[in-house]
Regions:
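Core catalytic lobe of class I
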Residues: 1-264, 272-274, 294-299
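Conserved phosphoryl-transfer catalytic core
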Residues: 270-298
Length: 299
């Protein structure tokens, strides 16, 4: 991929384990949502929960080698109820990645503001999914300022009811280990968000049964990928990560082993391209077929 291109997107059909080792460029960020364990078998290859950690970790080397030294990977993953209890494959998978050399930087929760209805005798509705942030180093690239949110009036309102030591509490005074000075929040226009991201499920059909909201990749791309950097989604599905990256002025590589999803994301990316002020994106849009090693350019 030519780094001088404006908002370039490359779509590749094939298995990331075979494709990524043959690519020369390094990426800044991997954002992806692997296939759900043992679900939606009619739509894509499904892995049994007992085999999931071994299966996903088989991509480890390809991911690790294509990522820059200060790069990150964000894995959106949902656990599964098996025989009435929650299977532990999610945590086994993350532990396995850490054993292979990755650092666990942060755990995020995608809070679904409109979870699917249903009834189960021993549990409630699933209203969240994991988003794990792993990195090759303990100090990956991060731009917290890019995701700060408005402070609002909560600091002033809270301080109005606090005085003296209630507003400024030091560790040495109560041995709580939680020192704080709420007065430091006064006057700040923007502050860091929490690690809980509240976003609705995607309601409309986008040619894929499990499309995460555009806000999810947008958040992580802003936070973990510099402008003009390269984002990779090795399980690209409907191309949602690609659309987010292009809108944020990043380059993107989308890989999927399902031909029908390649067609879906190609159509969606072309539609997004129409919204840009120039035709640069369309002109630079590549579709590569790894099996025949030919890059076909759209007109």
């Amino acid at each position: 991929m030519n780094r001088n291109r404006i908002n370039s997107c490359r779509i590749i059909h094939g298995d990331s384990r075979s494709i990524l080792p043959n690519m020369t460029e390094k990426v800044d960020l991997i954002v992806t949502s692997p296939p759900y364990a043992d679900a939606r078998k009619k739509h894509y290859d499904s892995i049994h929960p007992d085999e999931f950690s071994d299966w996903l970790s088989s991509f480890h080397k390809a991911f690790y080698e294509i990522l820059k030294p200060n790069g990150s990977i964000v894995i959106n993953i949902k656990d599964k109820i098996v025989d009435g209890t929650r299977h532990r494959f999610v945590w086994k998978t993350i532990e396995k990645f850490c054993e292979l050399g990755w650092y666990s930087i942060e755990d995020y929760i995608w809070h679904k503001t409109n979870p699917m209805p249903g009834y189960w005798p021993t549990r409630l509705r699933d209203g969240w999914e994991y988003c794990f942030h792993l990195a090759k180093s303990k100090s990956p690239y991060i731009n917290q300022a890019a995701v700060k949110i408005p402070t609002g009036k909560w600091a002033e309102v809270r301080l109005a009811n606090l005085t003296g030591k209630s507003a400024i509490r030091h560790n040495s005074e109560n041995n709580s280990g939680f020192g704080r000075d709420l007065t430091k929040w006064v006057g700040k226009e923007r502050v860091l968000p929490s690690n809980v991201l509240s976003l609705p499920l995607v309601g409309k059909n986008m040619g894929h049964p499990a499309v995460y909201p555009i806000g999810l990749p947008v958040f992580f791309i802003k936070l973990l990928c510099p402008e003009k950097g390269i984002v990779l989604d090795p399980f690209a599905g409907s191309g949602q990560t690609g659309i987010a990256a292009l809108q944020l002025n990043r380059n993107v590589i989308l890989v999927d082993n399902q031909r029908n999803y390649i067609e879906v994301m190609t159509k969606r990316i072309k539609e997004v391209a129409k919204n840009f002020s120039t035709q640069t994106l369309v002109d630079n849009f590549d579709i590569a077929s790894y099996q025949i090693n030919v890059v076909k350019k759209t007109p």
